[in-house]
């Protein structure tokens, strides 16, 4: 995340004042918040084998989060977001690179099905490939697990899947 006195116009370079790097993403932030609130959270994501993955894994370890079901890609980098914030207006511009999360396969998703046995909630979002979200929502619905979906960043998702979501 970078702060700057004003956001650049197309083709403009502006000098920033602050730069911070850390873990994040909608799913990660939601999982951490639920964990800190006392929920029994198993983090499910797909990471590359890079320094961004190390940051995420180290943070999960420091927080005492379950990370034994994290998936890995040897071919694709960990997803990241480039965030610029205008210091005066607090307006931001964000570019999300889905990275490894966008490569979750149906087989990988199916391998996580047992996590929903006895689960009360599935908390998910769209910073991943939509087909994996649709598949896990369908599985959760069949198992009677309540589904919470953060619909950002906006991507097309079927009405059939949305009808299975308990909270958007």
Describe the predicted segments one by one.
Residues 37, 76-79:
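Short, basic and Ser/Thr-rich N-terminal targeting/leader segments
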Residues 46, 57-72, 84-168:
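Ribokinase/PfkB-type carbohydrate-kinase core domain
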Residues 20, 42, 81-83, 93-94:
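Residues embedded in well-ordered beta-strands
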Residues 1-46, 51-62:
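Glycine-rich phosphate/adenosyl-contacting loop at the front of the ribokinase-like
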Residues 14, 18-25, 29, 51, ...:
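Residues at secondary-structure transition points
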């Amino acid at each position: 995340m970078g702060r700057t006195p004003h956001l650049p116009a197309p083709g403009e370079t502006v000098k920033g004042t602050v730069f911070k790097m850390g873990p994040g993403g909608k799913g990660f932030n939601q999982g951490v918040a639920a964990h800190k609130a006392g929920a029994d959270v198993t983090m499910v994501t797909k990471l590359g084998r890079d320094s961004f993955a190390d940051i995420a894994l180290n943070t999960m370890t420091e927080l005492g989060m379950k990370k034994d079901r994290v998936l890995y890609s040897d071919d694709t980098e960990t997803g990241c977001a480039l965030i610029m914030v205008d210091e005066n207006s607090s307006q931001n511009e964000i570019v999300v690179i889905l990275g490894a999360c966008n490569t979750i396969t149906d087989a990988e998703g199916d391998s996580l099905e047992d996590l929903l046995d006895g689960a009360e909630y599935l908390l998910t979002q769209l910073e991943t490939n939509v087909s994996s979200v649709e598949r896990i929502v369908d599985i959760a619905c069949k198992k009677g697990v309540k589904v919470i979906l953060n619909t950002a960043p906006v991507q097309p998702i079927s009405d059939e899947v949305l009808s299975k979501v308990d909270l958007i």
